[in-house]
Amino acid sequence: MNLLISFLLTIQTSVTMLFTLPALPYTAEALAPTMSQETLNFHHGKHHLAYVNNLNNLVKGTRYETMDLEAIVRESDGAIFNNAAQVWNHTFFFEQFKTTGCEAKGNVRTAIEKKWGSFDAFKTEFNNAGATLFGSGWVWLVKDANGNLEIVKESNAGNPLT
């Protein structure tokens, strides 16, 4: 019995992870006028898909082949990191949109207002962070180790996991 369990565990841990492009949780035109269907299709169907395909090709035959996406982002560097982090970033990005529009509420809203004084002041600072980010990259609202909210700018594929 122990031999069978050991064999099954070996098979399970040697299965190759194949990353796929997540389906959008809304239609491509649902975010207009905030984001046009053309822009959404370009970023999801071209950029995001390219990162997924690149990552699958890059991890073949490496120690990353059986890892989940977050582990790859945390442990890799170079081209594998860049593509894995962009898959994670884009997936997170597309999951945040709501077709009905909304503002933060509850504990998040309270923490934002405590830190920035008002939700509008937060939006101004967040938008300014994006507008002043040189080149490509991401702007994140994060909670630091002490529980404080911060706006963080990351170049290229950088993200809060790293």
Where are the regions a protein language model picked out?
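Feature for soluble, non-membrane regions of globular proteins
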Residues: 15-162
